[in-house]
């Protein structure tokens, strides 16, 4: 199914104090257009290498986590990944590359069924809109979510990315 929605960006008041610059950007995104297509896909084992961050702020925009990670990468021409893990007692976000790299933390994801959102629009708004849609239309399960960020300007109106949200597999 393909969808186009005008959404009001409501996270501006929830942004932590240390993200004042990002908050100003978000407030400018008062009304954005997010275009997305959704399909259900079964993925096998996945492995990533990256930097992990833990904390309560991980339910909010994570742009501040990407800065140190991307600073250590040389002008990447490959996708980067954001992996959100919430095991109940702690929240972890991993900025990552596909595959293995001994200089970074390794993370492996078990096979799962995902609602894969192909998104077009500013990444910050697009990611949150995909979660909003998934909560209404799928039974989400307690597995890590994956954000796929191709190279490019993540806040451009024509930026394209994917979000993989784990869902209960229909039998």
Identify the meaning behind each predicted range.
Residues 1-171:
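A solvent-exposed interaction/effector surface
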């Amino acid at each position: 199914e393909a969808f186009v929605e005008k959404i009001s960006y409501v996270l501006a008041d929830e942004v932590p104090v240390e993200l004042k610059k990002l908050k100003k950007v978000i407030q400018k995104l008062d009304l954005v257009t997010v275009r997305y297509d959704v399909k259900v896909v079964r993925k096998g084992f996945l492995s990533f290498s990256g930097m992990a961050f833990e904390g309560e702020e991980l339910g909010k925009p994570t742009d501040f986590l990407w800065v140190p990670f991307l600073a250590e990468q040389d002008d990447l021409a490959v996708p980067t990944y954001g992996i959100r893990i919430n095991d109940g007692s702690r929240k972890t976000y991993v900025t990552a590359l596909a595959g293995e790299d001994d200089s970074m933390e390794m993370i492996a994801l078990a096979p799962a069924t995902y609602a894969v959102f192909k998104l077009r629009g500013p990444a910050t708004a697009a990611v949150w809109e995909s979660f909003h849609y998934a909560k209404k239309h799928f039974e989400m399960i307690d597995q890590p979510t994956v954000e796929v960020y191709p190279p490019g300007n993540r806040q451009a109106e024509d930026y394209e990315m994917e979000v993989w949200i784990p869902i209960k597999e229909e039998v």
